[in-house]
Amino acid sequence: MRKTITKTLSLLCMLCIIICSAFTTAGAASYPNDVKTESDSILLVNMDSGQTVYEKDADSKRYPASTTKIMTYIIAVENIADLDNTKIPIKQSVLDVLKNTGSSLANVENHVGKSMTAIDLLYSMMVPSGNDAAMVLADYIGEGNVDNFVKLMNEKAKELGCENTHFANPDGLHDPDHYTTARDLYKITTYALTLPRFEEITNTCTYTCDAVSYTHLRAHETKYYYM
């Protein structure tokens, strides 16, 4: 069967609070810090000029949740030479760690004992924010040890100049030792935008790969529907 992944809101739509390319240079003057906002941390940057338009607690540590997967994407793309043809085995043991965690899933478990291409797993991770796809990629690149993958994530964060970021897992599940800042996330995302297919994948609303058919609907309460 074929699998269709559909999302009504992009996984990365939340990044509008930290990245903005719509501001022209003429209108790039910083806004006053008394602007009313709901988010705890904000960094709004003109991507054309690199000028900060507005910021609020941009260096305070926050839990990144699913935006963690931006770094997971970076490590995956930099360590898999052929995204379209590399086949990655799906192991039940890797997926079992997500049970009872309330994880968002991409139905990867339907492929246990089989393989999926790296590109299908990247779409499965980024479009419906599939923690299962993130774990499979991390296990593969970490050669059977997800901790090896997480080490690569932290090394990359330092390389990118992140000063208040530490990753504890590849999927973003809550951990007191798993944090970043709006400024660091801006650095990570800016770098990700230079990598192959990142912008293409994160702008995708529907993706079809060889798997079971289901429809994924996202709203504020994050519900999943399979059919």
Ranges and model annotations:
Residues 215-222:
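Conserved small/polar residues in nucleotide/adenosyl-binding loops
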Residues 27-183, 187, 192-193:
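Active-site-adjacent loops and short helices of periplasmic peptidoglycan-processing enzymes
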Residues 2-6:
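Bacterial Sec-dependent N-terminal signal peptides
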